[in-house]
């Protein structure tokens, strides 16, 4: 009977569905595994990147179910966001309709691949019930001071008419639509992620060896802890009069280089710069250039060519008394440190580049024979008055102590990470559950009024926020004073939704109506044992999710410190050397692959083509090869003896049979390492192929039965439909249990040894594994007699189980 993928796959998907095979068990005393792949945005169709992500997670989930774990393997949809509004404009369809139609289609696609997701715990973040508890979290965080309002410069996308977080600006453009981003001053809500900066940094230690080093480094750099000196510099008298300021604060991590300061660089937003601008003390050209810098995102400022302008004012060096010119510069950020940088060109590459460009003084204060800038934090100080000849570290500590003693400076810790702006001026998002009252100011909604849902009678035009234009939706009564008030019309950044969905999945779905998170369930299931997703989420989603876990812990919802125990970042799927995209015309439709070859072929190719963490190059021939392997497996299974296994005795097998059995058990041994540790599915599949090839040379019915029993177990998480089908035919599915290694199979009857003479290989021979060292050496000499003739052996070396080396002269 020929292999018919479609019939087999539909049959088993129906059986699994009817028997709720993949729902987590209610018994919370069982050992558990929570396997989670990052959920998709419902764009309309899944792509090969999704297939790869979910195949990896599904293989792990199926494996752990098979060996007796209670497995939670959920899926949902990150369903709020700007693309739905863009689609509404383009296709004249409501964002909600577009979103839920896409979800319905993508659900069919996902289950057609045999993914073992829990259907009962499926959710969309745009569901009112999800919004309700998200709004509850927002209010609780607001009441605790973890969310606040302020007016600040924000990244503004003119195309999408919304605010973007720093992390959502890529090369000066919107990460979603690619449009230019400008700076705009606006009021908004901010999440105080900086309150957890120290803990977020410290707890990265817990994730070492469990998360990719690259992700840990990216997060460490983004948090950006630096310890240093914050100190005051007085302005000279003329500058005081111009700026209406008497001094400015500066932060430095290199107090040891303070005598090398040749200029102070200020952010364009610094109060001193703004005072000069307000008094028209800068010419129009400088004014225009400062405004241009202000329109750059923080990331652009850091990466673009260094630019600056002398402000015509001076500060006084606090120790030497020298006058230091003040410049405005594009590389200084207003919200890092004090928005002012002490520049030491001799010992900092950026400062050196700037000083060279504008012909500013370069003062060396650390002794070195190397070319400047010398940026190492080691060496003896020079030109530093009483601190000369001290090494850098000692000088740094003494200089800080002197500043503290004079009460003009102090030790401080700074972080690069900024508070997270979550206000978005768009319709298709979770409404911010706050009220603006003329009498009371900003007031939270009452919890019993949640969820605050979106009105459906809106016009999506792409111009401004539709909620602002709605005739009645904003109108409400202030819960504090009872007067007329207005709802907040901004909606939440969609990263707010994806920052806690994993905890919602961990809650028993029977409690979803009553509470955000079920204490008993989340205590059992959290943290996620294995999280799988792209490296592109290293900073955005993964950092926000870590913050949410800690904030919800402190609010009493969760108990764990970290949301994800282990993290796997899978590589991209490429075709013709480039990431698949419609614009490049290199997209492969998963539906077409399933229709032509079946889901198991797609799954097998995805896991065999490359290790999960590496990029995967799509190859049509390799897909054909995966299909042929499954056909071959199916065809050969038709000749395997059905029923109970016959016990094999190792001593009764011939050489070829022992070798084939060894290859089968080597594959089994590898499966334990792959499923538990390395996820190198490609090597496991290769080991199974090798075992089947060795088995083809044998004519032992009982051995073939045992081999298929084991190999179907190994491959079931990877190609489940065909393995369930064959296991039902051959073993009535009784093989789905934990398999154990038989160590006697790994004991070899014979050894294959190499013989070297003076380090050069001369012969190979086979000998019984029970042979003594003396017998092995004698056999080695016999096999190399022609090279030993007329020579004397001065040394005999035997490396057990590997080789013999004879040293002659």
Swiss-Prot record:
<dbReference type="InterPro" id="IPR009008">
    <property type="entry name" value="Val/Leu/Ile-tRNA-synth_edit"/>
</dbReference>
<dbReference type="GO" id="GO:0005524">
    <property type="term" value="F:ATP binding"/>
</dbReference>
<keyword id="KW-0436">Ligase</keyword>
<comment type="similarity">
    <text>Belongs to the class-I aminoacyl-tRNA synthetase family.</text>
</comment>
<keyword id="KW-0963">Cytoplasm</keyword>
<keyword id="KW-0030">Aminoacyl-tRNA synthetase</keyword>
<dbReference type="InterPro" id="IPR015413">
    <property type="entry name" value="Methionyl/Leucyl_tRNA_Synth"/>
</dbReference>
<feature type="binding site">
    <location>
        <position position="582"/>
    </location>
    <ligand>
        <name>ATP</name>
    </ligand>
</feature>
<keyword id="KW-0067">ATP-binding</keyword>
<keyword id="KW-0547">Nucleotide-binding</keyword>
<dbReference type="Pfam" id="PF13603">
    <property type="entry name" value="tRNA-synt_1_2"/>
</dbReference>
<dbReference type="InterPro" id="IPR001412">
    <property type="entry name" value="aa-tRNA-synth_I_CS"/>
</dbReference>
<feature type="short sequence motif" description="'KMSKS' region">
    <location>
        <begin position="579"/>
        <end position="583"/>
    </location>
</feature>
<dbReference type="GO" id="GO:0005829">
    <property type="term" value="C:cytosol"/>
</dbReference>
<dbReference type="Pfam" id="PF09334">
    <property type="entry name" value="tRNA-synt_1g"/>
</dbReference>
<dbReference type="InterPro" id="IPR013155">
    <property type="entry name" value="M/V/L/I-tRNA-synth_anticd-bd"/>
</dbReference>
<feature type="short sequence motif" description="'HIGH' region">
    <location>
        <begin position="40"/>
        <end position="50"/>
    </location>
</feature>
<dbReference type="Pfam" id="PF08264">
    <property type="entry name" value="Anticodon_1"/>
</dbReference>
<dbReference type="GO" id="GO:0004823">
    <property type="term" value="F:leucine-tRNA ligase activity"/>
</dbReference>
<keyword id="KW-0648">Protein biosynthesis</keyword>
<protein>
    <recommendedName>
        <fullName>Leucine--tRNA ligase</fullName>
        <ecNumber>6.1.1.4</ecNumber>
    </recommendedName>
</protein>
<dbReference type="InterPro" id="IPR009080">
    <property type="entry name" value="tRNAsynth_Ia_anticodon-bd"/>
</dbReference>
<dbReference type="GO" id="GO:0002161">
    <property type="term" value="F:aminoacyl-tRNA deacylase activity"/>
</dbReference>
<dbReference type="InterPro" id="IPR025709">
    <property type="entry name" value="Leu_tRNA-synth_edit"/>
</dbReference>
<dbReference type="InterPro" id="IPR014729">
    <property type="entry name" value="Rossmann-like_a/b/a_fold"/>
</dbReference>
<dbReference type="InterPro" id="IPR002302">
    <property type="entry name" value="Leu-tRNA-ligase"/>
</dbReference>
<dbReference type="GO" id="GO:0006429">
    <property type="term" value="P:leucyl-tRNA aminoacylation"/>
</dbReference>
